[in-house]
């Protein structure tokens, strides 16, 4: 693994809240007095930083994920620290998924930076806040991951992979 550094056009694997949850997050920001200066469409949770965005890196990620088979998982956030939404305690699925994703990418020879995954979602960047509060739970199923180039105040999508349920659920 390589050290994380400042990239001009960083590339990330991430997931984003769905529109309904994004609307709930906008309401939460209003209730908490968080100024929305970062477009809600760009709110995300980073699963894995890749490095500088290049055609080669994008192609390598596409090849690695061509055969990546993973199921959807749920995330739930129930408290805020500063301007960062934090997860409900006890969630194992996001970390398990992230480790499997990292292993798959690394097995395909993609050099990855050192990265300690910690589930969170930043609602604002650049400010400082001592806010600490429980919030009404915001939960959704993560059913796709995105390859995003970030920079200059925008997200450019370079890939999208659905997560597919492999085992049928039965109502009893």
Region annotations inferred by a language model:
Residues 1-172:
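Histidine-dependent nucleotide/RNA phosphoesterase domain, centered on the 2H-phosphoesterase fold
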